């Protein structure tokens, strides 16, 4: 059962995040912990990575907003974090950040589903380029259904 103050907390966190150049991803309240823990996850509005400094900066602002709102009368721990990146790459920033990382590309070719594994080289307007044993293979972007990070095998 969600905490009864969760909607108010989400509204407060969203307004605080927006005012500081962030986007709210998730708010959770863990009442089974002593003291209670409030976890807020944020992303940068411009899509760039959230740093520890960003978390510290937002933590101070969120703490002030919580204290001013007087939503909680009991002690709590405030945790600010970023959800990080999932396995799948979507944005241009993802492809820049993970250049050289091992990936698996799923794509369609002549009505069959294919998979190709290699090191991410780049993504252009027309193709996704991967390095397979030192050779660059280009896969048309419109055929690509998924690009996901994998663990290197050794």
From Swiss-Prot:
| Alphabetized PANTHER family for the sequence | RIBOSOME MATURATION FACTOR RIMP
This chain's protein is named: Ribosome maturation factor RimP
Tell whether Cytoplasm is among the UniProt keywords: yes
Quote the function comment for this protein: Required for maturation of 30S ribosomal subunits.
Q: Which SUPFAM superfamilies match?
A: YhbC-like, N-terminal domain
Q: Which organism is it from?
A: Prochlorococcus marinus (strain MIT 9303)
Similarity comment: Belongs to the RimP family.
Query: Is Protein transport one of the keywords?
Result: no
Q: Which Pfam families match?
A: RimP_N (PF02576)
Name the GO cellular-component terms. cytosol
For this protein, the record's InterPro entries field holds: Ribosome_maturation_RimP, RimP_N, RimP_N_sf
The gene behind this protein is rimP
């Amino acid at each position: 059962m969600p905490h009864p103050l969760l909607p108010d907390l989400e509204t407060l966190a969203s307004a605080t995040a927006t005012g500081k150049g962030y986007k709210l991803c998730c708010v959770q309240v863990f009442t089974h912990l002593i003291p209670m823990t409030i976890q807020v996850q944020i992303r940068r509005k411009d899509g760039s990575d959230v740093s520890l400094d960003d978390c510290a900066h937002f933590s101070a602002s969120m703490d002030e907003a919580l204290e001013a709102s007087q939503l909680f009368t009991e002690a709590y721990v405030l945790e600010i974090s970023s959800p990080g990146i999932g396995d799948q790459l979507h944005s241009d920033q993802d492809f820049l950040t993970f250049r050289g990382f091992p990936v698996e590309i799923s794509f369609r070719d002549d009505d069959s589903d294919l998979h190709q594994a290699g090191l991410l080289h780049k993504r252009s307007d027309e193709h996704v380029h991967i390095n397979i044993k030192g050779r660059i293979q280009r896969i048309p972007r419109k055929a690509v259904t998924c690009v996901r990070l994998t663990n290197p095998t050794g």
